[in-house]
């Protein structure tokens, strides 16, 4: 047992050593209990007074030591609590003059801020992408296209000639809109075919996930990038009466003639035809696959740099007539007769006296569904007989509205096939109208149609049409921004969804069949 070194502890030890044996002896003796309790209480009171005196002496010594410390004026006095350093470290305790360390009476707490992880919003955070340098290998007898491009098309006629499938029926110079002109702006070099735009800039077709949407094929993505990003090697008019222009794009073989065929081309239309881009994406989502790839592009050398739709030039389209802009001449009356004959359905070869064309019966059902959703009237209702047209509509401008009295003789327009595939149609000039009210929808487009494609109807009935359109249209950066971002795109989708509900109601009310059309 060690002896205490301080005076206070020595006294406590002495009292305890004397009192404890005597208390035990007193407790075990036979004295009266009253006297024993009195003695025990007196001893406890004496010890309690001693403890109080010890506490008072200790507090007095602590106050004197504080007065001897370094003096600080009240003007510069720190708060009574120590500050927590911003860097998360603690300062060492202050040292006394005698070399001893003053023990602080405050517990220091180091606060470590919680690291906030940024929100990864799909479609807004662009990951880093590896640069891939692919070398295109050309097959014998074909010219390789540099970068993301198309397979070389067969040789076409000169670009300054009348273009099949595009020329005469598309009078794109609108009243009050300035005609096309060449503007020397940024990214355009004067002199011959060198209107090259910078090729090192970021692609306008943005794909941030590992793969593109399933309804867009690899060829679709490659062609979209070709139209959106390739430099322009030449600019030629389609026809003297048309406002459209052919852009001869970079990507042909070195030394190739600057014309469509050896070089890839795109048909550049005016800003008012921007709905062509929406039509392309809707066609792919519905599984029709009848439109040509279309993107939106800012043409620095024309139209003051405003976004314009550019559609892939396809040299495989059949030649079109100048009056109806169609590869097959049909009137409304003959078209209704073809619908009754159901030409080529279920593999049946039509009889010679049936008057059938080479076009499959299901193609008309797909066209009618597509045209109704976008309210395209320039194919099946060129005279605007099924709705109330506006003054700026082509049928009013051309004076065709009074011809509705004889609808059977009204000619169909923009009925185009491919040379190597006459059974299927190609939907061109797909300018849609989103401002058509519900009471002014053109139901004439659905006359005579008794079947609709099951794949397209299933998409319209599902709850995923909006999601797919947003995902698909987001790929085209220029189109997305030109429509006001997501808010503007949502308004267009609202119109399509409402028309889809009306079409489903029409199908149920008229007993129209929904069939698989994957012939």
Swiss-Prot record:
The keyword Membrane applies. It is found in: Golgi apparatus membrane. The chain crosses the membrane at residues 38-55. Glycans are attached at residue 289. It holds the Pfam family FAM198. Its main location: Golgi. It is a single-pass type II membrane protein. One of its GO terms (cellular component) is Golgi apparatus. The keyword Glycoprotein applies. InterPro entries: FAM198 (IPR029207). Residues 56-519 are extracellular. Residues 1-37 are cytoplasmic. Keywords: Glycoprotein, Golgi apparatus, Membrane, Signal-anchor, Transmembrane, Transmembrane helix. Residues 62-103 are annotated as: Disordered. Residues 68-77 have a biased composition (Basic and acidic residues). PANTHER family: GOLGI-ASSOCIATED KINASE 1B, GOLGI-ASSOCIATED KINASE 1B-RELATED. Belongs to the GASK family. This is Golgi-associated kinase 1B. It comes from Homo sapiens (Human). The gene is GASK1B.
């Amino acid at each position: 047992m060690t002896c205490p070194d301080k005076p206070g502890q020595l006294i406590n030890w002495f009292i305890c050593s004397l009192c404890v044996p005597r208390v035990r002896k007193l407790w075990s003796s036979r004295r009266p209990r009253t006297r024993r309790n009195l003695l025990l209480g007196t001893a406890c009171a004496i010890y309690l007074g001693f403890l109080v005196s010890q506490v008072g002496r200790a507090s007095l010594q602590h106050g004197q030591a504080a007065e001897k410390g370094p003096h600080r004026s009240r003007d510069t006095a720190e708060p009574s609590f120590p500050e927590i350093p911003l860097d998360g470290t603690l300062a060492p305790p202050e040292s006394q003059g005698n070399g001893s360390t003053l023990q602080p009476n405050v517990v220091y707490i180091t606060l470590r801020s919680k690291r906030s992880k940024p929100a990864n919003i799909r479609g807004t955070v662009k990951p880093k992408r590896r640069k891939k340098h692919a070398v295109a290998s050309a097959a014998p007898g074909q010219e390789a296209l540099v970068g993301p491009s198309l397979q070389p098309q067969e040789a076409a006629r000169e670009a300054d000639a009348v273009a099949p499938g595009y020329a005469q029926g598309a009078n794109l110079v609108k009243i009050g809109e300035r005609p096309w002109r060449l503007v020397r702006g940024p990214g355009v070099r004067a002199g011959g075919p060198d209107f090259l735009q910078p090729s090192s800039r970021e692609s306008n077709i943005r794909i941030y996930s590992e793969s593109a949407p399933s309804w867009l094929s690899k060829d679709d993505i490659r062609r979209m990038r070709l139209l959106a990003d390739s430099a322009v090697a030449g600019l030629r008019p389609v026809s003297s009466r048309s406002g459209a222009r052919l852009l001869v794009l970079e990507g042909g073989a070195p030394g190739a003639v600057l014309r469509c065929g050896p070089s890839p081309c795109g048909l550049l239309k005016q800003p008012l035809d921007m709905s062509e881009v929406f039509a392309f994406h809707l066609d792919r989502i519905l599984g029709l696959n009848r439109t040509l790839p279309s993107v939106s592009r800012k043409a620095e050398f024309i139209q003051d740099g405003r976004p314009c739709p550019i559609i892939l030039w396809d040299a495989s389209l059949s030649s079109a007539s100048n009056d109806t802009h169609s590869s097959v001449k049909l009137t409304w009356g003959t078209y209704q007769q073809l619908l009754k004959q159901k030409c080529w359905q279920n593999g049946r070869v039509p009889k010679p006296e049936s008057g059938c064309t080479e076009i499959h019966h299901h193609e008309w059902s797909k066209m009618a569904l597509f045209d109704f959703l976008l309210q395209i009237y320039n194919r099946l209702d060129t005279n605007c007989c099924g709705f109330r047209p506006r003054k700026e509509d082509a049928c009013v401008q051309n004076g065709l509205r009074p011809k509705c009295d004889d609808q059977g003789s009204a000619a169909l327009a923009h009925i185009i096939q491919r040379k190597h595939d006459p059974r299927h149609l190609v939907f061109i000039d797909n300018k849609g109208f989103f401002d058509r009210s519900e009471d002014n929808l053109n139901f004439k487009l659905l006359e005579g149609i008794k079947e609709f494609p099951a794949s397209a109807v299933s998409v319209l009935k599902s709850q995923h049409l909006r999601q797919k359109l947003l995902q698909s249209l987001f790929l085209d950066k220029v189109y997305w921004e030109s429509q006001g971002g997501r808010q503007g795109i949502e308004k267009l989708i609202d119109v399509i969804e409402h028309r889809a509900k009306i079409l489903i109601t029409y199908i149920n009310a008229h007993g129209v069949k929904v069939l698989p059309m994957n012939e």
